[in-house]
C-alpha cells in the first residue's frame, strides 16, 4: 500500500502543474437547527471575501486534482422581533478538488470538480443590541468545520504559462447534534493560473 501511494505521489508531481490564485465573494447561508429540531427563518445570507492559493496537477490528460489554502469570510445577518443582528467571521483552511476537464477549443476549458474543505475560525463577532459578542468561545463557530460540495470553472489559457479563470463553488457543512449550525457558502471568484 505504501508503494502504491508513493508511486501515485511521484507520478502526480511529474505531470504538468499550475499554481492558481483567486479572489471572490462568498454568499453564505447559516442553517441553524435548534434542540427541538426547528429551523428558524430569521437568518439571511450575507456576503464576505474569498481568497485562495492552490496547486493543480493533471492525473491524466483530462482529469485534474488540486489542493491549497483558503481564507473565507462566512457572514450572515438577521433580525428577531425587529432587533437586527449580524455575524462577521474569518476562517482559514485547506481545500481540495478532483474532476474532469473538458477542452472547448481555442484555449478554453470547462472543469467540474468534487470538493472537500476543512477550516477553522480565526476571528468572529456577533453584533447584537449595539455591542459585539466574541464568538471564539462558541463551539458552533470555533470548532473545526468540514465542508463538501462541487465547483465549475471556465478557463482561458492566454499563453503556455498564464491562464485566467472564473469559478463557481458550492459547499455544505454537515454538523449533527441536538443544536447545530451549518454553513452553506456559494462562492463566485476570478483568478489567474501560472503553469510550470
Tell me what each language-model feature is.
Residues 3-13:
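Sec-dependent N-terminal signal peptides
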Residues 30-43, 71-92, 120-144, 175-181:
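Flexible, solvent-exposed loop segments that connect beta-strands
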Residues 25, 49-57, 69-71, 94-102, ...:
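Residues on the lipid-exposed face of transmembrane beta-strands in outer-membrane beta-barrel proteins
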Residues 85-107:
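Helix-adjacent hinge/juxtasegments
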Residues 20, 74, 139-141, 145-196:
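Predominantly the C-terminal beta-signal and adjacent terminal strand-loop region
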Residues 16, 58-60, 103-107, 157-161, ...:
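Outer-membrane beta-barrel channels and translocator barrels
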Amino acid at each position: 500500500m505504501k508503494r502504491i501511494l508513493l508511486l501515485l505521489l511521484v507520478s502526480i508531481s511529474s505531470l504538468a502543474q499550475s499554481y492558481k490564485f483567486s479572489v471572490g465573494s462568498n454568499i453564505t447561508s447559516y442553517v441553524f437547527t435548534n434542540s427541538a429540531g426547528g429551523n428558524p427563518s430569521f437568518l439571511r445570507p450575507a456576503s464576505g471575501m474569498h481568497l485562495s492559493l492552490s496547486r493543480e496537477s493533471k492525473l491524466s490528460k483530462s482529469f485534474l486534482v488540486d489542493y491549497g489554502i483558503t481564507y473565507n469570510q462566512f457572514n450572515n445577518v438577521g433580525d428577531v422581533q425587529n432587533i437586527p443582528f449580524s455575524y462577521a467571521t474569518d476562517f482559514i483552511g485547506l481545500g481540495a478538488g478532483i474532476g474532469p476537464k473538458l477542452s472547448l477549443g481555442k484555449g478554453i476549458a470547462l472543469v467540474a470538480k468534487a470538493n472537500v474543505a476543512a477550516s477553522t475560525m480565526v476571528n468572529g463577532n456577533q453584533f447584537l443590541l449595539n455591542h459585539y459578542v466574541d464568538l471564539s468561545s462558541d463551539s458552533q463557530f470555533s470548532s473545526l468545520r468540514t465542508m463538501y460540495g462541487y465547483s465549475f470553472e471556465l478557463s482561458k489559457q492566454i499563453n503556455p504559462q498564464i491562464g485566467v479563470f472564473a469559478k463557481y463553488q458550492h459547499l455544505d457543512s454537515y454538523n449533527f447534534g441536538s443544536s447545530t449550525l451549518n454553513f452553506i457558502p456559494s462562492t463566485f471568484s476570478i483568478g489567474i493560473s501560472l503553469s510550470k
